[in-house]
Each structure stands twice: as structure tokens, then as C-alpha cells.
Amino acid sequence: MKLEFKNIKKIFGQKTALNNISFTVKSGHAFGLLGRNGAGKTTTIRILMNVFKSTSGEIYVDDKPINYQTVSFGYLPEERGLYPKEKIFDQLIYFATLKGMDKKDAIKSVNYWLDFLNMTEYKDKRLDTLSKGNQQKIQLISSIAHDPDIVVFDEPFSGLDPVNAKLLENVVKEQVKQNKIVIFSSHQMNYIEEFCDDILILKNGEIMISGNIKKIKQSYQRDKLLISSKDEKQILDTFPEQAEKDNFGNIILHLKKPEDKQKTMQKLIKEYDI
């Protein structure tokens, strides 16, 4: 399957939320959608899932306008939302069948993912008796148990401890292995680099960078960092001889030595809102 966004534009009143957004993702690949809050990531996802209609542009699947009756989606929202007082197994089966899966297949799939995430012992418990991390695992299962064609993860690693983050990594790899289209929305580049072949970085509804991660990294000089931050003044003051602003409002930080890149990045992430 090939998913293609073609010149998608979305206008709310006088505000252009997305301006001519285009990208392509194929089955068996993960795609990273990056940007700070308000960049346009959520609007892009909602247009993809037919929550919003685009002002102009088109979405294609296998070179034909998308048919939402035949393409199935799995969506893990940043805001979690299952029934806290209901038994876990019952509601997972309910959601899988609600999304069109046969009950027998739903039972098999739910049991598979409960086992995959080491959650079988909790299947007959209520959701509100579980820890936050385990509740997130159940939410994850509800988004993929019905075997969707396209899986969308919206800030999936938010609030996860390292153990659960690793489990989620394994789920993502399994989805790619099963030939799904996987779309990540995140502001955490380290996770995006772990899974994604291609990325699209948004700022104020505009594409800043788009393409294959490896090729993008090769095309940029090793002695520079491109930074987008709310703390731009502090960064410019901290690195007065090394930092400058580009035409897009980003900061270009010139490294004294290329081998300092990792150390400098860690300092920036720790001390500033990057």
C-alpha cells in the first residue's frame, strides 16, 4: 500500500494551519512527523483520519483518492481514553469488533497483544486498577488489535518509563514487520531516528525539512546544528560567537569541533526548550 499526501492545505478562518503539505509512505515503513506544539502535526493527522476536511489538496492510496470504507486506521492519541470501570479484555474485544473485526479473530488478536506486552494476567481486571504505564499498554492494544492498514501514534512515548518505552519500540517494529504503514507524530527526534525511514518537519504549518533521514543527515555539514527553540535568546546569549538565526527563524549553531555535536545536543536538550 502507498499513502500519499498531495498539496494538502487547511485554513481555519484567517489562519493557515497547513500550507501545501506533501509526503509519501509505503507499507512496511515508518514515517516521522516532527514539530513543536502548534506546528500542524495534529491537524495533519486529523485530515488523514477524515476528522477534518482539507481546504484543498488530496490524499491518495495506491494512486487513487482514499476510500475510508476500505482503508482501516489504528490511532493511539496523546490523550488516553478507555472505560476505567470496565474489564480490560471485554472492552478490547468490544473496540476490535466495533472497528469491523470478527469476534473470533478479535479474541485471538487481543490475546496475542496481551501476551506480547506481558499483560495477560490483567485481562480480567478493571482498567482503573492498573498503573499508568500499564493503562497506556492497554490503550496501545486497543489501537492495533483490529489489524489496521495504517497505524498513527501521536506522541506515543510521552510519560513512558524506559521499560515501557522499550516495549512500545518492540510493538512499532512488529507493526513494520507486519507490513503496516506507521506514522509517528512527535517532538522527540531520538525516537523518530530509531524507527523512521523518512521524516517531515513542520513549523507553523509549513514544511521545513522533508525526506530520507540518512540523506538529510548526509546533506548537512557535520559542524552545524539546526535548532528551533522558545529559548532562542538564551541560546544566542550562551553561544554569542557560534549561534546565528537563519531565514526561517531557526538557530544555526556552528560547532568548534564536529565531535562536540553529541555533547552540545545533550546540553541544549537538558537546559532549554528544544
Tell what function each PLM region has.
Residues 5:
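Conserved catalytic Walker-motif region of ABC-type ATPase nucleotide-binding domains
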Residues 9, 66, 89, 189, ...:
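Alpha-helix N-cap/helix-start and coil->helix boundary motif
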Residues 10-184, 189-203:
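ABC transporter nucleotide-binding domains
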Residues 169-255:
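ABC transporter nucleotide-binding domain
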Residues 244-274:
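Non-catalytic connector elements of ABC transporters
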